[in-house]
Structure formats: C-alpha cells, structure tokens
C-alpha cells in the first residue's frame, strides 16, 4: 500500500477571506504564504503557515455562498482539533484566547482527550486538546 506521510493542509470555506485569515493568523501566530483567485470557479483563496508545527491552513471564499452556517450535526466537518503538549499548554492557550477576546469553554478534564473548545468567525467548531497518557 502507498504511504501517506501526513495531512498536507486543511482548507475551510469562509464567508470573508480577509477576516478569517487575520483571525487565524493572530490565533496561531502563522504567516500568510499564498493568495490567489480563480475567476472560472468564482473563488479567492489564501494559505497560512505556522512554522513550529509546520501546519498549513487554507481558506477559500466562494463568490456564491451557502448562508445556512456551520453545524457539526450536518454531515461533513464536525470540528478541527489542534494538538498541544500537556495540561499546562492548555492553560497557556486559555490565557491566549482570553487575551484575544475569543470566547471558549473551560478546560474540560472529563473529556478524552482533555480539551478547550471555541469557534472561528464563521462558527466552525475548533478544539485544543492533548492526549492523557
């Protein structure tokens, strides 16, 4: 069987490209690495890169958009979870989210894995978690 070496990137459809790119860039300390558009498909897109984790996140804004909003109950994406090292890292992230004014859950130690949940500007469910060992 051919080998998969990892997830190359995660791409989200967003209502406002500039708003989402600014929000995720500030949240993750990432940098904008690519922008482009394709008139044939009616899209504008951007990719950001977070060097510590080597994570690439991409965003697409469609000229024609569905406006019903995100729901984890609709088949498709449930949430995106960012991995952190340990409980102390979750506490640091809670402080970072607070400093950015991003509403979030308390640390949920009763979950497996322990986590903090919040949403992006489009209501996409996000999580910070670490595996209990």
Where are these regions (language model features)?
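Alpha-helical elements of the RecA-like P-loop NTPase motor core of helicases
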Residues: 21-22, 91, 126
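Core segments of cupin and vicinal oxygen chelate
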Residues: 2, 11-56, 61
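Short Gly/Pro-enriched turn/cap motifs at secondary-structure boundaries
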Residues: 37-38, 71-72, 106-107
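A short, local hydrophobic-aromatic micro-motif
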Residues: 5-8, 33, 78, 105
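Vicinal oxygen chelate
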Residues: 2-3, 7-15, 46, 51, 68-133, ...
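A short, acidic/glycine-rich surface segment
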Residues: 34, 43, 64-69, 104
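Acetyl-CoA-dependent GNAT
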Residues: 60-66, 130-132
């Amino acid at each position: 069987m051919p080998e998969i070496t990892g997830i190359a990137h995660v791409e989200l459809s967003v209502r406002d490209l500039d708003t989402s790119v600014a929000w995720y860039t500030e949240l993750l300390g990432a940098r904008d690495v690519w922008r482009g558009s394709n008139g044939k498909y009616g899209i504008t897109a951007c990719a950001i890169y977070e060097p510590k984790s080597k994570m690439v996140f991409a965003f697409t804004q469609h000229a024609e958009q569905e406006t019903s909003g995100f729901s984890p109950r609709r088949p498709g994406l449930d949430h995106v979870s960012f991995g952190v090292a340990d409980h102390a890292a979750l506490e640091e992230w809670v402080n970072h989210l607070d400093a950015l004014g991003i509403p979030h859950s308390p640390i949920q130690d009763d979950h497996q894995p322990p986590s903090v949940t919040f949403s992006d500007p489009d209501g996409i469910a996000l999580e910070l978690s670490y595996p209990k060992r």
